[in-house]
Amino acid sequence: MDSAACAAAATPVPALALALAPDLAQAPLALPGLLSPSCLLSSGQEVNGSERGTCLWRPWLSSTNDSPRQMRKLVDLAAGGATAAEVTKAESKFHHPVRLFWPKSRSFDYLYSAGEILLQNFPVQATINLYEDSDSEEEEEDEEQEDEEEK
């Protein structure tokens, strides 16, 4: 099902609305896919033997219609006059979902200022995942020893 079919599947516009605003008769009043349950479930897979189209774009799912990823171009910094930071930001391509790994020992730093600075300097939609590092394991062992001493 393509986007035109999704638009056709949406509920029809009442005649009174068309009479009041004839210019709107040519454009749909609702977004395609919002009113059609078949478009809501679409991601290109087969469900109940019928192939669904792609009405909603999901960046984490690749489809056959996607163009191949372009290779990063080599940029001559001297000729372009751009700094390395500007080139990195302009030429970088991210594969979503982006996951940033943050040590559990620094989780309180994230809650206050360091996490805010991290997200300002990394301006893409990303998920921060906490991981066990040597510092956080030592803290857990210290807490366990303190608990044992209290008993």
UniProtKB/Swiss-Prot annotation:
Origin: domain of life: Eukaryota
A single BP term in Gene Ontology: somite specification
Principal location class: nucleus
Compartments in which it is found: Nucleus
InterPro entries: Ripply_fam
Gene Ontology cellular-component terms listed: nucleus
Compositional bias annotation for Acidic residues: 132-151
UniProt keyword terms in alphabetical order: Developmental protein, Nucleus, Repressor, Transcription, Transcription regulation
Record bears the keyword Signal: no
Intervals of motif WRPW motif: 57-60
A Pfam family recorded for this sequence: Ripply
Region (Disordered), start-end ranges: 130-151
Region annotation Ripply homology domain: where it falls in the sequence: 96-131
Family (UniProt): Belongs to the ripply family.
Domain notes: The ripply homology domain is required for transcriptional repression. The WRPW motif is required for binding to TLE/GROUCHO proteins.
Protein function: Plays a role in somitogenesis. Essential for transcriptional repression of the segmental patterning genes, thus terminating the segmentation program in the presomitic mesoderm, and also required for the maintenance of rostrocaudal polarity in somites.
Protein name, entry field: Protein ripply1
Lineage summary: Eukaryota, Metazoa, Chordata, Craniata, Vertebrata
Gene: RIPPLY1
